[in-house]
């Protein structure tokens, strides 16, 4: 269900029992028509159009990352406007919209009839824009991207792009259609837009380290606070609000966080692993922290025989590191996210300092909107989807305790993300009698 923010839904109105479906359909048709009418004279544009033409932006998912992406999109091109927003929850929508209005003023042109709340809100927001920013929990990303491509919209997809192999395949299929339509597709791997990372990769590919033997990636950061349940929340609403701690919504920490380091390793190797094995667990269970592991240690193997050793650790009080390291036959390269110094040691040492304050989150949107304006080739979907799949394969290995082959993982039909039609639907995972959620057990949990 989708309802314009601030408007009563059919369940809140005094109507006969036979009326809800008709009334909901009427509301959706009326709100969409009103929203479209209010944009008359503000024409849709495609790729490579005159920069004088304004670009209309829609934001789907108004939380912190979504509002951040909208802020960067508006900063990337001065002739853009945010014209529609959608979110599951009215409070999240309002908070994100208020923050954007405070910074960008009348460039945030989103009256109430273009604020959409509910499961289907994305459809109405996407229809009103030239460019869409997809920043909900990643279980919804495949469906949202499919809709954007169907309607011919350029799209920014926050990472990860899916929670399971069926979702990855859906994204790749939609990406093929996007390419045929000359749509620009960006994925939120901002490190690929950092000058220091780009230069380091160029040198590694040029042979400055000799043959790459292995890479290491760390995403060891403190645990964020879980959401305390309120009495008025249904089980599904609670999980959607506390999405970070449920694998069907976030894909688990290894996919949501370590994915950046995994993507850097794939970039270094110029391909994707053929298999993975490893382990993970949850050290301390709590009702507020869902059904995720809090640490992983995975080894991925590439076709060349090179390895990626990855760690993701969210346990409090443990060693923290967000870094990538590349070891070759003739040297070593160290990537420190957030620092401005990049270095290679070994036979051909090198060091580079980049401008302090470089913001890769902004750079990725600068590059994206430049490609739209100039009709440049721009498609980050392939590595966006396949680096997501690499991370999912690592999660499969930890959950199962098995060696997981790429081909089997990619072909798997086992899904974490059910189709949700309403927040009244049953939740995909339920707490046990002690209030704790069941977690995977290596050696017993099936992942293929």
Predicted regions and their residues:
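N-terminal secretory signal peptides
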Residues: 1-21
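N-terminal secretory signal peptides and thylakoid transit peptides that target proteins
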Residues: 14-34
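C-terminal helical cap and adjacent loop that interface with cofactors, partners, or active-site loops
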Residues: 29-34, 38, 68, 260-273, ...
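N-terminal Rossmann-like dinucleotide-binding module
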Residues: 33-105, 265, 445-448
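Predominantly a Rossmann-like dinucleotide-binding segment in NAD(P)-dependent oxidoreductases
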Residues: 61-65, 180-186, 191-290, 298-300, ...
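A structured beta-alpha segment of the ubiquitous adenosine-cofactor-binding alpha/beta core
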Residues: 103-134
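Beta-strand-loop-alpha-helix segment that lines the small-molecule cofactor/substrate pocket
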Residues: 130-131, 138, 142-193, 207
